[in-house]
From Swiss-Prot:
Name under which the protein is recorded: Putative competence-damage inducible protein
SUPFAM superfamilies noted in UniProt: CinA-like, Molybdenum cofactor biosynthesis proteins
Coiled coil ranges: none
Gene symbol of the encoding locus: cinA
InterPro entries reported in the protein's UniProt record: CinA (IPR050101), CinA-like_C (IPR036653), CinA_C (IPR008136), CinA_KH (IPR041424), Competence-induced_CinA (IPR008135), MoaB/Mog-like_dom_sf (IPR036425), MoaB/Mog_dom (IPR001453)
Family to which this protein belongs: Belongs to the CinA family.
Top-rank taxon: Bacteria
Amino acid sequence: MKAEIIAVGTEILTGQIVNTNAQFLSEKLAEIGVDVYFQTAVGDNEVRLLSLLEIASQRSSLVILTGGLGPTEDDLTKQTLAKFLGKALVFDPQAQEKLDIFFALRPDYARTPNNERQAQIVEGAIPLPNETGLAVGGKLEVDGVTYVVLPGPPSELKPMVLNQLLPKLMTGSKLYSRVLRFFGIGESQLVTILADLIDNQIDPTLAPYAKTGEVTLRLSTKASSQEEANQALDILENQILDCQTFEGISLRDFCYGYGEETSLASIVVEELKRQGKTIAAAESLTAGLFQATVTNFSEVSSIFKSGFVTYSLEEKSRMLDIPAKNLEEHGVVSEFTAQKMAEQARSKTQSDFGISLTGVAGPDSLEGHPVGTVFIGLAQEQGTEVIKVNIGGRSRADVRHIAVMHAFNLVRKALLSD
């Protein structure tokens, strides 16, 4: 089924509102195996909408129109579709009853004739009830093309799509997806490594997406059941993770989790809870961002004891009992300082882990280190590990954000090695 989405509304063309409905519809249609080939926006103009309907009817088997179902003069979607199909507009009894109730409960509201238009549908259409508004939607098939009209406000469109439209469009197959999350490898390198799989993909498919500090891979397949989809996605996932970087490192080492909402922080927090271990932090350039990220999750008092924000040399010495002369000798941006910060954070809070971050967020260099230089220390019973990462060419906010991601990844690896 080839689908086309037509957004009706001059306010979209003038930039007054963003057409989020198209993104939502495309995503939900893809989940049930319906491919969207075209997205178009047209103003509140009958002639131009008629022209667009003529084009859409020739190239698409499902035409979805959003917006223009309200009571005002420029709400002309249903009227124009009826004219295009040579059909009349008729009243939907359920929608009329909803109008009756609405105005009965609001005696101060004037029930003007134009309000009645919201209860009309194209003759022969299946009504799509509006759970949160008054304008009824509709679904109609004519000459092999299915036409759907939906309200423009997302608060009305979304429940109508989820509860009314999608169940009526369901076919034998659906689109199933799996998201793999990678940290420590760039999108360009990952795409180069997976070039053969990407170039030769048919079904399942894979698509890379770069995000701040990480890369995700979306694996998708059309199948009649979750079990059937899992078989296909498992094969593709193993093919991906069996690949190696140019240095011979397996991609499995970079894949940290699954899903749209998963993050390095959520993985670490859950693993700390599972293992019953605690962590403390001492932060300089990130100014408490690691600690704030941990405490964004609920019920973390069992794993997070306390922390330190030691932005200046003096506070590193005072709060963490690191001799000032040693800090001056080695520099605040150094392996030594990261090591001592982590060890003192762990010792002072009696935690299983102590994590530290010190570096140069920018915009200026510090102690001869370029912007983006970060030292991260992780102290635990077995000893202390310090890594140096270079996060160059980024904004100050991105340097801090990615540094925290590196810190969580360091903790994650330590937890997995236990």
